């Protein structure tokens, strides 16, 4: 729940189901031992890098991998290994979540592929799967910088200044189970608040997990290194404001038609209406901010036609 009613997080639409991309071409002919050794080295490097970046406050040994495929994406094979496909791009790049950073079953397939084709068979075991993997790596901190920051020229970790405050939205990867995402969110909130920063709002939906906070540049740079963080960005802003939609001063407003004393009366129980000259003589007692719509409907439409019946 938001700590402050006036700082509620803007609810973004839920993510649609991930689009499955085409099957792709067969895997290229490869030197099995050399290719499997290359992938094993890349996997070890990604694991070791993420272990170095991991903060003591985040004890779960999860692994987030960026995998470039050349053939079919083989999402079913990754899921059979217990990995969660977080995203897939048209350039045949997958982002994968492994709940354990050893990935023992994947290494078993690498070993089988490395031994080559068994007697009487043309291809090594898992040829389509392992042979279709081009590279294995990590999601880098700069990859987590959101599009609105990039549009403002902040494209590298070093662009976030120590002494500057940033109001940001932090999105966590859709790791699967809700309780797992809630636990990751709680870890991040505790980390932020322990360092004197302020968390304004949190949201855990069916597929979106976000929080909004005000942080200094040091903390922003730290969050960019947390594997479970999908993106760090500025909050969304409206594409248009009311003043741009309708710039009118009272002296230029057209005359209002007289309210018939027999006009229907609409009773609404609410509060919070500020005085407005267009509502003079119409509101009895308290009102509320939707009253103009109930009385005149859309004002732009009302001013473009002959005013019809008004309500009290």
Swiss-Prot record:
Q: Which UniProt keywords apply?
A: Plasmid
Q: Where is the composition biased (Basic and acidic residues)?
A: 1-17, 28-39
Task: Locate the region Disordered.
Answer: 1-39
Organism domain of life: Bacteria
Name of protein: Uncharacterized protein y4kK
Provenance organism: Sinorhizobium fredii (strain NBRC 101917 / NGR234)
